[in-house]
Amino acid sequence: MSGKPVLHYFNARGRMECIRWLLAAAGVEFDEKFIQSPEDLEKLKKDGNLMFDQVPMVEIDGMKLAQTRAILNYIATKYDLYGKDMKERALIDMYTEGILDLTEMIMQLVICPPDQKEAKTALAKDRTKNRYLPAFEKVLKSHGQDYLVGNRLTRVDIHLLELLLYVEEFDASLLTSFPLLKAFKSRISSLPNVKKFLQPGSQRKLPVDAKQIEEARKIFKF
Amino acid sequence: MSGKPVLHYFNARGRMECIRWLLAAAGVEFEEKLIQSPEDLEKLKKDGNLMFDQVPMVEIDGMKLAQTRAILNYIATKYDLYGKDMKERALIDMYSEGILDLTEMIIQLVICPPDQREAKTALAKDRTKNRYLPAFEKVLKSHGQDYLVGNRLTRVDIHLLELLLYVEEFDASLLTSFPLLKAFKSRISSLPNVKKFLQPGSQRKPAMDAKQIEEARKVFKF
């Protein structure tokens, strides 16, 4: 059977949001099955649907794919968003990993223990401003093109846009000294599929607030 | 210029060892420039050689590739150890990510604060025995083949062998109830390139003891 991919995850961004973004940018419609209780998760495990007892899991082309990177790589390859040869893929992979590292750092802030929050927030801001954003500003400056790799849209442009939106939510002033990244953000945001995903009513997920996290923590005991 | 890949990292396993393993299994000779002082690391950064100011970094085919997964993907593609099509690659990626997750968990034990060590060791043992090894035993059982994916050697067989050797060092009893994994370990270990890498005098790195870690911690302030 083929048909739409089915995404299994919580009703939250977490480690699924980059997959939603990539599918949306590729113009692929998808269904979501939300895990709303520990029993839902237990059932997925018991039925042998989760290779390592974890989500994200995506049903696609007859497979039950787990692991964020495996899912992203498959979608990027299938929809030709992964460069034209292995050298372009190497750049795309290197940039993607940097983006995932910083995204993870920022995401972790919402679930980090209160006594560590200040130090971790300061570190995340420092890394954003002094390590990651300068690296990507430099890439754009080096070739002067509209996209990061190969002068056309690839997965990494979508990953970077997603990150820039999180950085903006986190502390918009962090973007001030990166004119090329700001232009990149508007440019990618205006691509038709992306524009659609950015509009209200799409399957994009909103940030969770402290109260929602408390509730999720009680239900899923993390 | 081409020539041998040059690996930049500390004289330790860390996040470079899986790259050493993959190159060795592919029969590729490589050079290592070991980082022996904070000044060595500072120089690499200052010269603009590290995209995100981090190692591992590998000079290969004119690129200065950072990020473990980007490096592994490039080597696996170049030396045809990445499956025959995108569905095989999806399995290889999913399995590889599970292996990297458990490897990271075991590696982190040596540098974790003493007061957390007991709990983290127990968790790592539990995950090894009840999550990861059963998942791979099941894959081997499901198809009865010698290799994990596509009935021939791929990167993921090398990653799994490396993990099984770490598990054995960690607590050999964890392997007892997995006969197919034990047979897999002997089988992959006897492949000529792998056998050579397993012999003393190769570029494989030994486990560090507590004293070496203390010294590294002082020098590199982690």
Curated annotation (Swiss-Prot), chain A:
Cell compartments where the protein resides: Cytoplasm
Annotated organism of origin: Rattus norvegicus (Rat)
Gene3D superfamilies, per the entry: 1.20.1050.10, Glutaredoxin
Keyword DNA repair: no
Keywords from the named record: Acetylation, Cytoplasm, Isomerase, Lipid metabolism, Oxidoreductase, Peroxidase, Transferase
Keyword Coiled coil set for record: no
Modified residues (N-acetylmethionine): M1
Entry's EC annotation: 2.5.1.18, 1.11.1.-, 5.3.3.-
Disulfide-bond pairs as recorded: none
Domain GST N-terminal, residue spans: 3-83
Protein name (Swiss-Prot/TrEMBL): Glutathione S-transferase alpha-1
Record-listed glutathione binding positions: Y9, K45, Q54, V55, Q67, T68
Subunit structure, interactors included: Homodimer. Homodimer or heterodimer of GSTA1 and GSTA2.
Catalytically driven reaction(s): RX + glutathione = an S-substituted glutathione + a halide anion + H(+); prostaglandin A2 + glutathione = prostaglandin A2-S-(R)-glutathione; prostaglandin J2 + glutathione = prostaglandin J2-S-(R)-glutathione; (13S)-hydroperoxy-(9Z,11E)-octadecadienoate + 2 glutathione = (13S)-hydroxy-(9Z,11E)-octadecadienoate + glutathione disulfide + H2O
Superkingdom, taxonomy of origin: Eukaryota
InterPro entries assigned: Glutathione-S-Trfase_C-like, Glutathione-S-Trfase_C_sf, Glutathione_S-Trfase_N, GST_alpha, GST_C, GST_superfamily, Thioredoxin-like_sf
GO BP terms in the entry: epithelial cell differentiation; glutathione derivative biosynthetic process; glutathione metabolic process; linoleic acid metabolic process; prostaglandin metabolic process; response to nutrient levels; response to xenobiotic stimulus; xenobiotic catabolic process
Annotated ranges, domain GST C-terminal: 85-208
Note: In addition to its enzymatic activity, the homodimer of Ya chains, called ligandin, binds various organic anions, xenobiotics, and azocarcinogen dyes.
A single GO cellular-component term on record: cytosol
Swiss-Prot record, chain B:
Subcellular location: Cytoplasm
Reactions it catalyzes: RX + glutathione = an S-substituted glutathione + a halide anion + H(+)
Binding site for glutathione: Y9, K45, Q54, V55, Q67, T68
A Gene Ontology cellular-component term: cytosol
Predominant localisation class: cytoplasm
Quaternary data: Homodimer or heterodimer of GSTA1 and GSTA2.
Function comment: Catalyzes the conjugation of glutathione to a large variety of electrophilic compounds.
Entry protein name: Glutathione S-transferase alpha-2
Organism taxonomic ancestry: Eukaryota, Metazoa, Chordata, Craniata, Vertebrata
